[in-house]
């Protein structure tokens, strides 16, 4: 825990400065870049998005799940299911991404689950047709890995709000393995930093190197987990 403080901050500032000066740092000026990180709940979408955001200067995270959670809070438990099947969710996410891309010059990172090809085309396909440089990656993992992560997110409990996610897990993973949802990055045996590196390489973006030690990397993951605990 002695690596915190000014030496660490100074090192990160130097790394960011060097990469900002590099001519190969990201897409041409003026292009609109979207990174959609797909996968079932518990695959590591949000932690990966957070890692990319920290290491990709000028990026912003636009989380489609926040729209779905708001809709779920308006519905009785008996009516809750996968929000990607709700037309209002898909329309809202598309419009919010359009607004974010129009108002922000840097890459937009969107961690969200899409397992239906029609829904995929309705959001990502539409944005591509409109000229957005939309990159998509899927983060499949073994069911046992996903369930373990969901339990960790809920502090070891079996939260009622995630029961529907577990029941849909096998179907989601089967869908995401299809070639239509490439690029596939299996996360079972990769660190979050390694997954972020692969995504950046696939999208042709240069991110700052990870200089986190194991403790700091764990703290970042834990902080992201705490922020996304679902209490109701």
Model feature map: region roles:
Residues 1-25:
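C-terminal alpha-helical interaction appendages
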Residues 37:
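Hydrophobic anchor at the beta1->P-loop junction of P-loop NTPases
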